[in-house]
């Protein structure tokens, strides 16, 4: 069901619920304000926007389709459409459509948006009285600035999260799980933000173009300030993305080094075991042959015979050690 709310620019005034049928009277009785059409039913909303307000049918079509971010100046009104963050999930976005006509800002949306909530707070404040002087262009500036500020808050949270991951990567005393997955997730989140903020920056830049005729001289300064904000968001995104990539490369390098160290330790253990086995193999063979067959070789049970056998085994062991040393398997690094 279509929900329509109106704010006529009064300080501290709440937005009033109304209906599409009553909007024409409200707009005649007041010179400026903000009309917010939420979850519009297509048939009645098309009727109101197209027939009552005489908005261009292409702009009206964009209210019920997936448009591209753009601005357009028609004969009797101006139109802008851009992405704003959806309140349901942090990085989900929905298109917000804005019409400017005779001092009125008319927004059409299909979802709850933090940017709209911030704009609602601003328009109710006592510092917002300039909307009566600058009409709908100033209202649109405040709306775009609210959306940009909302993205700035998201970036602040991402920056804090990135700092936390960097601290974990460079912590020498503890190994944290899922760091690589967290870094990939961070990179993905930054890309998703860029998909919305880059078109927003391009939209503001286009609004400022003199050939568009979208803004008046008295509001141009505000849009220039907004352009600086949207550009800084893009710059911060690039910096965070580079930081995440650098941290990921560092983590992969550290992981590779730890793996190499582990493999080196394993190789050292295997080398030591191989040396021991190599020495013990001939000694074991001697012990096996002479063990129960000592009488077959003409030897007796006296200590001299035992010492002779042990001497043979020791000589073989020493010979193996000398041979391994000469080959460089032990003693030389």
Model-derived regions: residue spans:
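A short, charged helix-loop
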Residues: 114-138, 163-174
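Cytosol-facing regions at membranes
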Residues: 1-5, 27-30, 164, 210, ...
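Alpha-helical transmembrane anchor segments
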Residues: 276, 280-333
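Membrane-associated alpha-helical segments
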Residues: 103, 147, 156, 160, ...
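Divalent-cation
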Residues: 1-131
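Long, non-coiled-coil amphipathic alpha-helical linker/lever segments
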Residues: 127-147, 151, 219-222, 226
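Cytoplasmic juxtamembrane "membrane-exit" helices immediately C-terminal to transmembrane segments
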Residues: 146, 150, 157, 322-327
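Residue-level signature of the cytosolic catalytic core of signaling kinases
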Residues: 136, 215, 299-300
């Amino acid at each position: 069901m279509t929900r329509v709310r109106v704010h006529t620019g009064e300080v501290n005034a709440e937005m009033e619920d109304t209906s599409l049928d009553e909007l024409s009277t409200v707009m005649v009785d007041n010179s400026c304000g903000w009309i917010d059409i939420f979850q519009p039913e297509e048939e009645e909303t098309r009727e109101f926007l197209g027939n009552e307000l005489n908005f261009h049918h292409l702009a009206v079509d964009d209210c019920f389709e997936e448009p591209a971010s753009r601005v357009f100046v028609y004969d009797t009104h101006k139109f802008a459409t851009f992405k704003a963050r959806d309140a349901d999930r942090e990085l989900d976005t929905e298109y917000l459509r804005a019409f400017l006509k005779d001092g009125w800002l008319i927004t059409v949306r299909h979802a709850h948006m933090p940017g709209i909530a911030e704009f609602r707070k601003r328009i109710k404040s006592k510092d917002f009285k300039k909307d009566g002087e600058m009409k709908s262009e100033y209202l649109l500036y405040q709306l775009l600035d609210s959306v940009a500020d909302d993205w700035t808050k998201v970036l602040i949270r991402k920056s804090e999260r990135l700092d936390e991951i960097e601290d974990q990567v460079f912590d020498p005393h503890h190994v944290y799980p899922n760091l690589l997955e967290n870094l990939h997730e961070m990179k993905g989140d930054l890309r998703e933000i860029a998909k919305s903020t880059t078109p927003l920056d391009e939209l503001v830049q286009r609004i400022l173009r003199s050939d568009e005729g979208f803004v008046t001289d008295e509001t141009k300064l505000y849009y220039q300030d907004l352009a600086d904000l949207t550009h800084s968001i893009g710059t911060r995104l690039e910096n965070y993305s580079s930081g995440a990539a650098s941290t990921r490369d560092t983590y992969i390098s550290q992981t590779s080094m730890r793996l190499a160290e582990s493999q080196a330790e394993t190789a050292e253990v295997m080398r030591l075991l191989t040396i021991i086995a190599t020495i013990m193999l001939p000694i074991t063979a001697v012990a096996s042959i002479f063990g129960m067959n000592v009488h077959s070789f003409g030897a007796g049970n006296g200590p001299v015979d035992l010492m002779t056998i042990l001497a043979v085994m020791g000589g073989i062991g020493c010979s193996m050690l000398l041979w391994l040393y000469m080959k460089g398997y032990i003693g030389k690094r």
